[in-house]
Amino acid sequence: MATVPTRSGSPRQLTTKQTGDAWEAQARRWLEGKGLRFIAANVNERGGEIDLIMREGLTTVFVEVRYRRSALYGGAAASVTRSKQHKLLQTARLWLARHNGSFDTVDCRFDVVAFTGNEVEWIKDAFNDHS
């Protein structure tokens, strides 16, 4: 677990959710700095969650944010398994349908923003609905 300093100066432990939220906020700011526009965060649809939905031009970008302290076992990007990709695709499909769209009618892609230690890696079009 990560720690953050408090007003008293002594560090406190962050929960897994707080750590994830902090990295998602960092990814959002980083992507906005690259010119993407924020649409939504923590979108839940039938058991799946999309960390961030952004827009780059006319493209809707579904973003999975990952953090790992080190590159052991492949680092953050390697943790987006085929099973996780399938869940993200299903969640995006449901979100698009809720917003009167589909993969056939909306230009979209799936990106991964991976933080490994102090490094950030942006994998554009990391996978797609044809994977």
From Swiss-Prot:
Sections of the chain in a coiled coil: none
UniProt-listed Pfam families: UPF0102 (PF02021)
Compositional bias (Polar residues): 1-19
Region (Disordered), start-end ranges: 1-21
SUPFAM superfamilies the record matches: Restriction endonuclease-like
The gene coding this protein: yraN
Domain of life according to the entry: Bacteria
A single GO molecular function term of this UniProt record: nucleic acid binding
Classification of source organism: Bacteria, Pseudomonadati, Pseudomonadota, Gammaproteobacteria, Enterobacterales
Family of this protein: Belongs to the UPF0102 family.
Protein name: UPF0102 protein YraN
